[in-house]
Curated annotation (Swiss-Prot):
Residues 164-174 have a biased composition (Basic and acidic residues). Residues 1-27 form the signal peptide. One of its GO terms (biological process) is positive regulation of vascular endothelial growth factor receptor signaling pathway. It is found in: Secreted. The keyword Disulfide bond applies. Gene3D superfamilies: 2.80.10.50. This is Fibroblast growth factor 18. Residues 157-186 are annotated as: Disordered. One of its GO terms (molecular function) is type 2 fibroblast growth factor receptor binding. Disulfide bonds join C109-C127. Glycans are attached at N39, N137. The keyword Secreted applies. Belongs to the heparin-binding growth factors family.
Length: 207
């Protein structure tokens, strides 16, 4: 003969159902938040204050620095070369940047063919890159418009086309370096010498 479930069994079933619903809601919120962060990282931010930095980008492959030579881009610049000094503007709260040559005032951009070019106007999304800090402490720059295409150079300092690049290739790995002659950006640690204060001896007066 069939017996009705006890009140305790019903409560347990309701509790398990409630726990399952909570887990589903938390999972959906986590997914939505990740999507929100990814969208914000890829989107332009015209509200936040932009941060401007000056440094060089040392190419792991060529052993030289990225140069913005007007419309031509290379990675053959020596340390301190005027064409290797880059003004880097943070474009969003995430890690999007625009890179401009300080000397030529041309922007580093990647066109639809994946070729690195210099442009006088950097407002196009082709001139925006997503900055990725890798596990080996190098930095990679992925095109914000053409996902999966990276800034890269050959051993001779020639630009590689975006479709032929991958994040794990040494060709797309760079190290940030401050330009020569800018000690205010790389002040060495200075030790301060502290001398022990000598005890003052009071003069004695005859009674």
């Amino acid at each position: 003969m069939y017996s009705a479930p006890s009140a305790c069994t019903c409560l347990c079933l309701h509790f398990l159902l409630l726990c399952f619903q909570v887990q589903v809601l938390v999972a959906e919120e986590n997914v939505d938040f990740r999507i929100h962060v990814e969208n914000q990282t890829r989107a332009r931010d015209d509200v936040s204050r932009k941060q401007l930095r000056l440094y060089q980008l040392y190419s792991r492959t060529s052993g030289k620095h990225i140069q913005v030579l007007g419309r031509r881009i290379s990675a053959r610049g020596e340390d301190g070369d005027k064409y290797a000094q880059l003004l880097v503007e943070t474009d969003t709260f995430g890690s999007q940047v625009r890179i401009k040559g300080k000397e030529t005032e041309f922007y580093l951009c990647m066109n639809r063919k994946g070729k690195l070019v210099g442009k006088p106007d950097g407002t196009s999304k082709e001139c925006v890159f997503i900055e990725k800090v890798l596990e080996n402490n190098y930095t990679a720059l992925m095109s914000a418009k053409y996902s999966g295409w990276y800034v890269g150079f050959t051993k001779k300092g020639r630009p590689r086309k975006g479709p032929k690049t991958r994040e794990n290739q040494q060709d797309v790995h760079f190290m940030k370096r401050y330009p020569k002659g800018q000690p205010e950006l790389q002040k060495p640690f200075k030790y301060t010498t502290v001398t022990k204060r000598s005890r003052r001896i009071r003069p004695t007066h005859p009674a």
